[in-house]
Amino acid sequence: MTATLLSNELSTLISDSKRKNPDLRNAAERSLQDLRSLPATSEQQIAADLSRHPAFVDPFLIACEAKNAKFAASGINCLQRLVICKGLPKLKLKDALDAFNASAALGLDVQLKVLQALPSLLQNYADDLKDDLLAGALQVCASLQSAKVQTISGVAAATLQQLVTAVFEKVGDEDRRAAQIPATHDVPGDGEPIMLRSAAFDAYRVFRDLALAAEERPTKFVQLSSLSPESSLELVFSCVASNGKLFVSHPELLSTIRSNLLPLATRALSEKHGFPMTVRCLRILNLILTRYFKRFPGECEVALGLLTHSLDSDTSTPWKRAMSTEVTRNFFATGALVIEAYAEFDQADGGKPVVQDLLATFVRLSSEKPAIIGLGQQSSIPIGPTPSGDGSDPATMEAAGGVAGVISSALGVAEASVSGISSQWSLPKTSCLDQLDKAEGPTIPDTYIYTMVLDCLNSLSDSLARVVLPLTVHEDRSDAVPSESHQADDQSQSSRKSRVQRSQSFRMRAVPANPLAIDENNVAPRLRAVAGIIDSCWPAFLATASTFLNAALEEQYYRNLIKGFQRFTQVAGLLRLNTPRDALLTTLSKSAVPPHVLSAASGGGTKSPSTDSPRSFSNHRNLLSVDSLVSQATSLSSDRDRRSSIEPAHPMLTTRNLLCLRALLNLAIALGPTLGAAFTVVVDTLRQADLILSNGSAQQLVRQNLSSKGHDTASAVQAFSAEVAAVENAVSRLLESTADYPSEAFVTVLEAFTRLLGAKPLGMPSLPTPTQASPPSTPTTSHRNFSGLPGISTFAEMQARDYKFVIPKLGNLAEMNIPRFVSNDAKESGWAQLVDELLQVAVSSSRPREARRAAGDVLCKAAAGVVLEVVEESDNVKGAIQRSGLGILLQIVDGIYSEDEELTATDLEIQALVLEALKAILERCGDSLVAGWDKTLAVIGSAFERTADAPTFRQGDTDTFVEWQYVTEDFVSLPIGRAAFSALQLVCSDFLSML
């Protein structure tokens, strides 16, 4: 095949050049004679024979140099065939490349043949293609890439890319055989000359010339004058992106980046270039920032400063600003670069606040066009830049009407005429940095830049958390190590089984370690940088996040914002940075219960919650008590068509508010033992949410909204109910986790709850927040405010609300911390405080009936709990606990009868609870009672009337004295007598010998 083709082409050249080019004819005749003289063997043999005859290719070279398209077509065709079959003599490689260059300006067929020959030349003559030969091959591709025919230009660009890639692959192969190849070439470095081997020297010269061509400066190795700066930058980007490890190990390449590439890429931020040049420069800058930040800290500082200016500048074109933000987003998303940048610049002595300035720019950027992001009083659903004409669409109805309540809770409250941020219209189909085919800057969605700011906030939180969270776990913890509140390791297995069972995930909970206490050399600097970022940048983070917390965001954007906010707050708390932690918690609290929603709910609901609210004090698990609210919503959907008019809807909590509440609770779970007085933020927020969800006016709102919208009622109620259930579960886990708190932290939690029983404010330091993060002011009312709840007009009503919220929580805390109470001092463990606070409520006739019953019930269960907890303990341990537990029952009874007022039905109900608790203790562990029998008899004796001059019971440290001569034979009431008789019957029948 090869011999035939060559013979035919030579014959054609002889025929066509008889009169026009005698030299070509003579050379062709000689080559044809040489070809015919070769033995007719295999193709491989013919190629090998031809490779030993350098003169054979002369007619083809002459044909290419003749500037005749017809001659050149034959010459190039033959040279291509010889290259493919390795029949081209190596001595003629340079001549062949010169011939290719000479023919590059001829016809389309000739150019295609040249481009087809070059890959084979690279493959079959790779070892020989170096120095000037390499430069010649690259020059051919570069000149053809500037061809006007798109086909030729595209193929030439791909071929040039292939050749450049091969150059760097040869460097990798050479590095693997470095010991066998001497370094013979020296090039200038940053400090001193660098010695290079052959392949590395070629790669250096090619890369340097590409960088020079991008700056439109004269090249030194390859003639690239015909190569456009944009094409040069694409090749440079490909080299750097595809050979990361190679560049790191070759300082001469890094030196070229520093001296040529970085200045060019950085100037694109401050100079005005067209889109094609700018996008390629910023792609390179993005690559260098994310991959070689540590190699060029000084240059990166300048670049980041210009990026900040580009983000903050109104003079930048929208597409340039968007590209700058994309580079910033990628910088934040790559590893821990932002932490390294802070340590390198902001934290250094005399360093510039690079990271701080960048985050401060986010604050200004996020608030520059509030209408575009749909900024309002709270977060809402984005409705899109163009409204829909179909009013029957559920999403459109919710958005246009701004309806609040359970329906909109499932979707989020939307305000009319907002655009907002959504993946449907805020994101371009292709990022700006990837639009290399555009000659003009693309149209950028107005809200695109805000999506990237949200991404930056999320990435920042992730980076901080990845550094800090792994260091907060105590490495020496194991299942055998109890928390501070459990110190009974020597107890038997049966004793441990009798204790209150808690989920295993919280059994090993302990105070998170403070990572800043770690003194390891490789960890401490990064931790100090993280702490510095939070300490100096939290106002900017908070202000930016606060803006978006009240913007119209798509669901996923909002959830990611909350997750990032939660992580940032958690890191601040774990590092014991209390000021930023408290400010962030407060902002999250206000997003969970917006002031305008709280004001509307508390101001509009003046009915007594004791009659309107369906909640039960004894319902410890249904912590937000909204089951009846949801069931009302479901049942009311059936009569929506019968209502002739709808009252104006008022603000209501949404699923997004509940999501914020859940995030706040999760933070309390993660940081609980370290929160201190800040725990009151969590308690107050939970109480406010409970107030709104259980308020009579809120339930009327549900009735209003469901009456007007029925076709999506079930799904909306289900979504709202699911979020409420998630919040309730988080509350349960929070209360459960207190079992592993140190006693001091647990007492703080108790104080956060018990202060509400007497409307006693617990001191909290003022929490600094930036002005940008301040929520709308709460409308004032003419009523006096109690417990921070506006609109509650009477002290009694405030107390009733707080009792219904607090007492069930105290019951949960008591249940979860029974082991703590029996193992520690009563005052240190919080037992004394819990009993005193609940006792004041239970025995006071001025307190609401339901509150008294609930407090008495909690006390009775706690008293029984501590007695049951020590059944398997030694007599010494049991005696003290049994006296304490039974003494509480006696204190309740004594407190009821110590007041100089007539007994009420509530007093008798509480006394009945006490007698039932006593009976339960006797039934379950009466045979293990070693102390407290005097208190038992005193409680039973309280069922009888006493004379007018009878003193109260006298309880000593160990004994209780009952002066029976003052006890009559008449029962206080018949039910009380029956309850006392049951307990006494147990004593007489089973435990008489123990008295």
Residue ranges and their predicted role:
Residues T2-E9, L38, I46-L61, L82-D109, ...:
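Amphipathic alpha-helical segments within extended alpha-helical solenoids and repeat-rich scaffolds
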Residues T2-L24, V140, E440, H650-L653, ...:
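Long, serine/threonine/proline-rich intrinsically disordered regions in eukaryotic cortical polarity
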Residues L13-S42, A69-R81, A96, L106-L121, ...:
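HEAT-repeat alpha-solenoid elements in large eukaryotic scaffold proteins
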Residues N21, K67-N68, L106-G107, K148-V149, ...:
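Short inter-helical turns and helix N-cap capping residues of alpha-solenoid HEAT/ARM repeat scaffolds
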Residues P59-V83, V140-Q162, V240-K245, S249, ...:
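Extended amphipathic alpha-helical scaffold segments
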Residues E65, I84, A104-A105, Q123, ...:
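Alpha-solenoid HEAT/Armadillo repeat architecture
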Residues I76-N77, G87-L88, A126-D128, A157, ...:
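Short coil/turn segments at secondary-structure boundaries
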Residues L212-E230:
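Active-site lining segments of carbohydrate-active enzymes
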